[in-house]
Amino acid sequence: MSDPRYQIDVSVETRYLPEQSQPEQNRYVFAYSVTIRNNGLLPAQLLSRHWLITDGDGHVQEVRGPGVIGTQPLLGPGQSHNYDSSTLLATQVGTMQGSYQMVAEDGHAFDAPIRPFRLAVPGALH
């Protein structure tokens, strides 16, 4: 069972961006909207991110970096942070997953997992 002081929940919504994609060149652009919510008992700050982006052929791109969209949000208990971003795949379907590296007010460092989610061109999955 996880410690109730350190509970960060992540939800993601995705959409295909046909206007930015070039299927004839195997370029499929997907937007994703992320909500990071602190359901723990202590304030916690997001320090960095780690993503694994896998295309339909199994090729994995690993992304690490500080913060999200240039910020390192501090979330009090019950607070959330939302941001939008995008990614490029060479296939019509893929997945993303990863984690946010957090530090709580008491100095405890922990990872907030981002469960795998699907990226798919509408109609690409049957």
From Swiss-Prot:
InterPro entries: ApaG_domain (IPR007474), ApaG_sf (IPR036767), Uncharacterised_ApaG (IPR023065). Residues 2-126 form the ApaG domain. Transmembrane segments: none annotated. Pfam families: DUF525. GO terms for biological process: error-free translesion synthesis. Coiled coil: none annotated. NCBIfam families: PRK05461.1 (NF003967). PANTHER family: F-BOX ONLY PROTEIN 3, POLYMERASE DELTA-INTERACTING PROTEIN 2. This is Protein ApaG. It comes from Azotobacter vinelandii (strain DJ / ATCC BAA-1303). The gene is apaG.
